[in-house]
Amino acid sequence: MGIELVCLFLLLLGRNDHVQGGCAWGGAESCSDCLLTGPHCAWCSQENFTHLSGAGERCDTPANLLAKGCQLPFIENPVSRIEVLQNKPLSVGRQKNSSDIVQIAPQSLVLKLRPGREQTLQVQVRQTEDYPVDLYYLMDLSASMDDDLNTIKELGSRLAKEMSKLTSNFRLGFGSFVEKPVSPFMKTTPEEITNPCSSIPYFCLPTFGFKHILPLTDDAERFNEIVRKQKISANIDTPEGGFDAIMQAAVCKEKIGWRNDSLHLLVFVSDADSHFGMDSKLAGIVIPNDGLCHLDHRNEYSMSTVLEYPTIGQLIDKLVQNNVLLIFAVTQEQVHLYENYAKLIPGATVGLLQKDSGNILQLIISAYEELRSEVELEVLGDTEGLNLSFTALCNNGVLFPHQKKCSHMKVGDTASFNVTVSVSNCEKRSRNLIIKPVGLGDTLEILVSAECDCDCQREIETNSSKCHNGNGSFQCGVCTCNPGHMGPHCECGEDMVSTDSCKESPGHPSCSGRGDCYCGQCICHLSPYGSIYGPYCQCDNFSCLRHKGLLCGDNGDCDCGECVCRDGWTGEYCNCTTNRDSCTSEDGVLCSGRGDCVCGKCVCRNPGASGPTCERCPTCGDPCNSKRSCIECYLSADGQAQEECADKCKAIGATISEEDFSKDTSVSCSLQGENECLITFLITTDNEGKTIIHNINEKDCPKPPNIPMIMLGVSLAILLIGVVLLCIWKLLVSFHDRKEVAKFEAERSKAKWQTGTNPLYRGSTSTFKNVTYKHREKHKAGLSSDG
């Protein structure tokens, strides 16, 4: 046994040899603290193993401890392990006694886990042949299911006959449901309470929640007889109280007659959705469902009007707890809803039911065969803080990671599952887990505990002479000092030496938290990343900035948190070279005069400039014309505009100098200015590659125009043009008048007038004759003659 342990330990050494740093860096002061530092850390309990640097050096990987001189028997490195308590072989073939059937292996084990380390165990499941079956038929007896009730009156005999081909031990039972008998789920008039179908008119039973009618029995004729006696009921809303019925059928184990060693099938038949959860608050029912059996002496659900409908989560818990497999037989309109429910409920299946339940027998047989062709594991118990993962190995030999289900299995085939378990921290308490196949009563019980203790902790020497005159207890190779004493061997008294001398300033941790105060002096911890040093362990050579993952860009040394760059390098993390060779263009100009050399690379300044040395610049133009804006601003600016001109020149990468430079190294330029002057200047480049403009001159400038004379000439020209136009107008008018007069004279000389009366003339005297006057004279003459 000892040789086997040594071989196992050496194997672990080889596996963990690559793990570096994390253990020693943790600063563990005891064996238990070391085990918590990491899953690959080990503790050396060998006496006098460390020097004054303290106990932290004892915690490291096993390989590093061996390299430091720790002997193998003194290395504490607990590993995760499995202790199998019970492992009966899986049953093969038919078993006479159902209590002897074993369908899962192993059956019981203890799992001790090192925090952070995984442990894998294998679970095997094999469904035995001729396994007993209990089938409970739960039917919706609302008015819409009347034709279905007539169809299943002979179902018992036919179902028993078909199931006898699959198992020799078959029992079936019957129950029914409608709805909670309370408003608003039913009408509450006296007539409707007595006969909910009175408005049709038709006689039906009063609304009820759930009735358990026939316990599980092998008498198929008894089932038929019970079904024939059933009558429908009615309610108002479309959803039914089916989930109330499922809950009672699952938890009322004794009354239903569920056997321990059998397959429990619950066939749920309905043509409507089901209420769940808080739907019952519409009826003022607010007490949550308690998940207990509430069948009275008449086998009716007595708490239908008191407790809420169960939630989906409550149904799942109780169905799994009682190993009940649910078969939803529902009509076309409801299939989608119940498929969603089945996805949440382990082992549940959905079948399409015809309008009159004509296919119920085929549906049940198909669902049974589907359930027997699948093996799925479920985990019960306290899993909080545990990491569990599954890998399925089905009968085709293919691995399915992260899957705990095998499909298309045959009865008698073996399904294997690799279960990987780990814990993340140490827990004093143990926990119990149960792994079981869905729908089967066989279980694997697992007791899980954390392995966080070292063997050396069982032995302790109080007031040991190894701890300087008995000033501490010796355990696992280190001294735990009594109050008032300190130091690796408890050789210093706290009243003699103050830890303030190990603090850089008041309020700072002792030895910067990276060392131990040993009798007034800091002994810095060892670090896998480098050295920790300084009177207060405040410095190290590994905490500087990194460039591309390299400390100080690999171009300098880290000293107390700052990079000290080597020759030819600069910058905060020594990533910037001072060499300008790569910035010099072919003509020897730094960045072609169009940029600045930054860290050995050209940063092009001119718009459009590109290339390693800014040599490409299609938009830069000729060097003379590109300086036009700078030159013209300089020539036209007064004292106040000099800053604006300096900005314009800076924008094109140039400066203007009054000094004279060598004409041999300068480029001569000439431009035509806005004022028609010829501007001449020279361009040169200094040692830094910057453009310098000098020797700026203006020549051949035209004289400015005589503005007063121009204005006088223009005015006289305008006046002269006006006079000429006026004369021309006068000549044209005179010519036209003369022409008209001559024409008139010619026409007058040709005219010959005749003597006669002007038809338009009227005389000055007019004679008017009064006709009335003549008659009046005649009348007077007549009167005279009569007289």
UniProtKB/Swiss-Prot annotation:
GO terms for cellular component: cell surface; external side of plasma membrane; focal adhesion; integrin alphav-beta6 complex; receptor complex. Disulfide bonds join C23-C41, C31-C454, C34-C59, C44-C70, C197-C204, C252-C293, C394-C406, C426-C452, C456-C476, C467-C479, C481-C490, C492-C519, C502-C517, C511-C522, C524-C537, C539-C560, C544-C558, C552-C563, C565-C574, C576-C599, C583-C597, C591-C602, C604-C614, C617-C620, C624-C669, C630-C649, C633-C645, C677-C701. Glycans are attached at N48, N97, N260, N387, N418, N463, N471, N541, N575. It is found in: Cell membrane; Cell junction, Focal adhesion. GO terms for biological process: bone development; bronchiole development; cell adhesion mediated by integrin; cell morphogenesis; cell-matrix adhesion; cellular response to ionizing radiation; enamel mineralization; gene expression. Its main location: membrane. The chain crosses the membrane at residues 709-729. Residues 22-708 are extracellular. Residues 730-757 are annotated as: Interaction with HAX1. It is a single-pass type I membrane protein. The VWFA domain (or beta I domain) contains three cation-binding sites: the ligand-associated metal ion-binding site (LIMBS or SyMBS), the metal ion-dependent adhesion site (MIDAS), and the adjacent MIDAS site (ADMIDAS). This domain is also part of the ligand-binding site. This is Integrin beta-6. Residues 730-787 are cytoplasmic. It comes from the Eukaryota. Mg(2+) binds at D140, S142, S144, E240.
